[in-house]
């Protein structure tokens, strides 16, 4: 069994961060070591929440504790997502470096959550800069959305062609694999959900159904990153991981839409996450 250290947010009610990523990865046969960066009552897009940011020192202490019992060497990958403070970036990179020193084959997937004020997603001051200046260069896999693609590349991304160029710029910064979670308004089709995957072998474009929610569910990016990484540690190629993830996420979104829910319906879709009925394929474009 493969082991993934998942350093993300935690919500008591609903699904975001580790609550979105852990169960689906476990369904894929991966043992998840969930380390929370915040503990909130609910995700921030409700507009109000209670809870706390986990002190940065606790991240290092917990990693050290796992190492002291001799288990850190068995970590196959690290994923980081929503961070509660800029200082946590440093602690996460220290954790990544420690894991890789013990297991040089371990992967680091950075989901560079930088906030989306228009959607009510708020991150602390300095997190964006820490991700850009430190985390990106350490990542083997980077999974930005459109906003993060612009911020990390430093380029305007107003159309599909510019998105491709921005991906190339980001790959030159260190990540071998870049997965754009949602092309949004720069995609080719207004009525589809579109994603990109880029690595040394080329660039792939994938479309899946787009569901129109009254309120967009949160945690889809966390689910996306988690499922992609679970497939990778299980030995799948980037393309295989990309296609399975896209189909599994589509099943979750379809189920959530049919149940008219604001929160992702992971439990209702649990069998479809492992064995999706959906069968969309990626198309190589470069």
From Swiss-Prot:
List of residues binding ATP: 111, 148, 181
Entries under Gene3D superfamilies matching the protein: 3.40.1190.20
Cellular component, GO, one term: cytosol
Annotated metabolic or biological route of this protein: Cofactor metabolism; pyridoxal 5'-phosphate salvage; pyridoxal 5'-phosphate from pyridoxal: step 1/1
Leader sequence segment: none
Binding site residues for substrate: 9, 44-45, 222
Keyword field: ATP-binding, Kinase, Magnesium, Nucleotide-binding, Transferase
Biological processes annotated in GO: pyridoxal 5'-phosphate salvage
Function of the molecule: Pyridoxal kinase involved in the salvage pathway of pyridoxal 5'-phosphate (PLP). Catalyzes the phosphorylation of pyridoxal to PLP.
Subunit structure: Homodimer.
Protein's name in the database: Pyridoxal kinase PdxY
């Amino acid at each position: 069994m493969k082991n993934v250290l998942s350093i993300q947010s935690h919500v008591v009610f609903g699904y975001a961060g580790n609550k979105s990523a852990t169960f689906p990865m476990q369904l894929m046969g991966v043992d998840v070591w969930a380390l929370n960066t915040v503990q909130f009552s609910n995700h921030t897009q409700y507009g109000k929440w209670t809870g706390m940011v986990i002190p940065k020192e606790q991240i290092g202490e917990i990693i050290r504790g796992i190492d002291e019992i001799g288990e850190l060497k068995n970590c196959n990958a690290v994923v980081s997502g929503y961070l509660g403070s800029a200082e946590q970036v440093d602690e996460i990179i220290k954790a990544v470096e420690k894991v890789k020193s013990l297991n040089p084959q371990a992967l680091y997937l950075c989901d560079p959550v930088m906030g989306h004020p228009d959607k009510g997603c708020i991150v602390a001051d300095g997190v964006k800069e820490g991700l850009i200046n430190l985390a990106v260069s350490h990542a083997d896999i980077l999974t930005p959305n459109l906003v993060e693609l612009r911020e990390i590349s430093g380029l305007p991304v107003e159309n599909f062609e510019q998105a491709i160029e921005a991906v190339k710029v980001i790959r030159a910064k260190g990540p071998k694999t870049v997965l754009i979670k949602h092309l949004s308004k720069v995609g080719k089709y207004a009525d589809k959900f579109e994603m990109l995957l880029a690595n040394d072998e080329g660039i792939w474009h994938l479309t899946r159904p787009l569901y129109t929610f009254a309120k967009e569910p949160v945690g889809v990016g966390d689910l996306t990153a988690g499922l992609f990484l679970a497939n990778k540690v299980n030995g799948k190629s980037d393309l295989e991981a990309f296609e399975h993830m896209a189909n599994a996420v589509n099943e979750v979104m379809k189920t959530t839409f049919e149940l008219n829910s604001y929160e992702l319906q992971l439990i209702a879709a649990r069998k479809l996450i492992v064995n999706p009925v959906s069968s969309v394929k990626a198309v190589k474009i470069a």
